[in-house]
Amino acid sequence: MKVSLRILVVGIAVLVFQSCKKPNAKINSQNKIMILGDSRVEGNRPDYESFRYELWKNLLDNGWAFDFVGTNYDNAKYPKHLGQFFDRNHEGHGGFRVDQILDGLEYYIDEAGVPSIVIFGGVGGNDALQGQSTALILSNTNAVIDYLQNVNPNITIFIDQLPPARSTVMTSTLWAQLDGIHNGILALATAQTTASSKVVAVDCFTGFDDSYLEEGDDSHYNETGAKWVADRWDAAMDAFYAGGKWSN
């Protein structure tokens, strides 16, 4: 069922988005990738890492042609790779729940353009920690997928079955909810896939452990963890496209 977007863009957030925005050199590619999610997408180098940089390197190494798009711009320092500067545009928002991402989607796409591929990470993490029910998390996630498919009926959406927080904060209740979210994401991916728009669930939790988290941080990646998660996204994308290469 298609869910209409609830128009709610907080003015302060809009100003922050605009102030963080910087123009990247134009990349001649129709493969527009929006990496969407929470602080695990946004990152805050050097305090903690996003998987975006490592995924960008993987995609370059594999010969993909693409352009990261989004209203946010990463101002941290990153080494060049294969002679190219890191494509810093993204749509990660620290602390956001899925409903807050849903509320911002119209603005993000109006400003950044319609993506052909969305990588939706950190789905349900802040929501669960803030006491939202699994049913509400999945309903909001379903609405995000609905909106994206409405603006681009041919969109491909990769969505994570998110990694856990540090084991010391994962109560039995949170573990049970995480399992419910994972199962729900898998079911949503199947139910929301159409003839022209594929939704792919990506296992970013099996094998994840505390060594992938920043020291003294209960939920954010260190460099090793960011690389591990990026490799999961990359493997899922490579498998989905059967080793083919996107062309400009």
What is each model feature region?
Residues 2-10:
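Sec-dependent signal peptide recognition
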Residues 16-31, 243-248:
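Bacterial Sec-dependent N-terminal signal peptides
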Residues 29-33, 62-67, 113-119, 152-158, ...:
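Loop/turn elements at helix/coil->beta-strand transitions in domains of secreted/extracellular proteins
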Residues 164-203, 223-227:
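Substrate-gating cap/lid alpha-helix
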Residues 122-126, 146-180, 203-205:
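Active-site segments of SGNH/GDSL-like serine hydrolases
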Residues 36-40, 44, 69-74, 121-126, ...:
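Active-site-proximal beta-strand/loop segments in catalytic clefts of secreted hydrolases
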Residues 40-139, 179:
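Conserved SGNH/GDSL esterase-like catalytic core that processes O-acyl groups on lipids
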Residues 36, 101, 216-248:
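Histidine-centered active-site loop/cap adjacent to the catalytic His
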